[in-house]
Amino acid sequence: MKKKASLSEEDQTLFRQLMVGTRQIKQDTIVHRPQRKKITEVPTRRLIQEQADASHYFSDEFQPLLNTEGPVKYVREDVSHFELKKMRRGDYSPELFLDLHGLTQLQAKQELGALITACRREHIFCACVMHGHGKHILKQQTPLWLAQHPHVMAFHQAPKEYGGDAALLVLIEVEEWQPPELP
């Protein structure tokens, strides 16, 4: 490491002569607050971990048996088939929407995991997943992935106002969830 060049006696004397009559500026207009550690890093890591955990449910090798005729639909064994009918009629309106347009399969899996995690955290029981038409890759894979997740109670092709056959309405199991009573 190099030493800084020191000023000669002449330069130091000249500097002192030029500074005669000056006074130090008192800086009192800006308050310097001590910098704090960013707290947002810990929740971000936790969210990433939750998304990764949720995406482990989605396998490309496992092919659940779904109805291939008519609209895409699925209901878990312990859930009433009447829930599918209510979804088809539009009795449920989604509170959260997920658009998968333009995503890769890996990104779509991660986003689905994040959606399910967010719904459970916010106690949202109905969400809409818009997979689009495209090359039909996500349109075919999305129902297969959703049927594998243990917190997905049911899904059905969305009504026209929510995307029709390019979207799915998904019922997600949240703690202490009760279906709303119809009038």
Swiss-Prot record:
InterPro entries hit by this protein: Smr_dom (IPR002625), Smr_dom_sf (IPR036063), SmrB-like (IPR022990)
Protein name: Ribosome rescue factor SmrB
Keywords carried by this UniProt record: Endonuclease, Hydrolase, Nuclease, RNA-binding, rRNA-binding
Subunit and interaction comment: Associates with collided ribosomes, but not with correctly translating polysomes.
Lineage: Bacteria, Pseudomonadati, Pseudomonadota, Gammaproteobacteria, Enterobacterales
Leader sequence segment: none
EC number: 3.1.-.-
SMART domains the UniProt entry points to: SMR (SM00463)
Enzyme category, top tier: hydrolase
HAMAP family registered for this protein in UniProt: SmrB
Domain Smr: 98-173
The keyword rRNA-binding is annotated on this UniProt entry: yes
Described function: Acts as a ribosome collision sensor. Detects stalled/collided disomes (pairs of ribosomes where the leading ribosome is stalled and a second ribosome has collided with it) and endonucleolytically cleaves mRNA at the 5' boundary of the stalled ribosome. Stalled/collided disomes form a new interface (primarily via the 30S subunits) that binds SmrB. Cleaved mRNA becomes available for tmRNA ligation, leading to ribosomal subunit dissociation and rescue of stalled ribosomes.
Species: Salmonella arizonae (strain ATCC BAA-731 / CDC346-86 / RSK2980)
Any one biological process term the GO annotation gives: rescue of stalled ribosome
GO MF annotation, one: rRNA binding
Pfam families according to UniProt: Smr
Membership in a protein family: Belongs to the SmrB family.
